[in-house]
């Protein structure tokens, strides 16, 4: 509804503050930034780049071995078996020490990235874009595939444009931007925003065309249920007491379709 779209979400965007991406936690996605003592930085953009930088560190005598190579990781092999050989989370990634142009060691920034950045990156992460997931990513996939040298002949390029297929294989519809997404109204400052922010920064595009925004479950006094407040009802307890179908029917009949 307009009250959520141009209202709640629009007001959030109009009064937007800078997004602090770092989090001082252990579990999560490490920030791929290495710093030296002079505040020089290296931001790593792929596992292939990290592999290459570790090789430089080994050559400079900073690291003794390349742990990715030691585990048999093969750059360019995007199979699950290959990626199961390595773990780039803490504490393992913190043992990787890179080298700057002066031969000095560089240590990883200890913070993690906001988990909402992970959520907002979903359209790209699910396809491992822009690595092997470029072909059917978005409506401009033909240009992307051609620019990434996946297509070597004009015949293949024409096939992609005319038949939406690649080397005889039909391509699924474009994944980005999404036709619609669905989440609770509280995601105007969460998932809706992070999807929109990252898509704008990276592609100057919307991440979704339509939104179905559902309401929130309230308590007997009309307040939002919250684990922090302690006014929640355990659904499993209700299912155990009344059965799954009565609970499901109650939820359906007490929520208007437009809520």
Describe the predicted segments one by one.
Residues 1-259:
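Structured secondary-structure scaffolds
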């Amino acid at each position: 509804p307009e009250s959520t779209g141009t209202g709640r979400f629009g007001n959030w965007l109009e009064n937007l503050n800078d997004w602090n991406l770092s989090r001082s936690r252990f579990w999560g996605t490490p920030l791929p930034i290495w710093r030296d003592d002079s505040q020089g930085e290296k931001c790593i953009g792929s596992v292939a780049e990290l592999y290459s930088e570790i090789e430089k560190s080994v050559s400079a005598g900073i690291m003794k071995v390349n742990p990715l190579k030691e585990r048999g990781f093969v750059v360019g092999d995007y199979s699950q078996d290959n990626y199961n050989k390595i773990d780039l989370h803490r504490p393992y990634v913190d043992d990787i020490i890179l080298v700057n142009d002066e031969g000095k060691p560089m240590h990883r920034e200890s913070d993690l990235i906001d988990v909402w950045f992970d959520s907002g990156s979903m359209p790209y992460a699910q396809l491992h874009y822009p690595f092997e997931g470029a072909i059917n990513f978005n409506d401009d996939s033909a240009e992307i595939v051609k620019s990434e040298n996946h297509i070597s002949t004009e015949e293949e390029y024409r096939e992609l444009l005319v038949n939406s297929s690649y080397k005889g294989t039909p391509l699924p519809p474009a994944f980005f931007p999404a036709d619609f997404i669905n989440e609770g109204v509280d995601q105007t400052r969460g998932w809706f925003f992070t999807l929109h922010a990252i898509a704008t920064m990276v592609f100057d595009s919307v991440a979704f065309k339509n939104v179905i925004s559902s309401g929130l479950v309230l308590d007997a006094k009309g307040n939002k249920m919250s684990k922090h407040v302690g006014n929640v009802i355990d659904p499993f307890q209700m299912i155990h007491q009344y059965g799954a179908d009565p609970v499901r029917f109650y939820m359906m009949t007490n929520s208007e379709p437009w809520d």
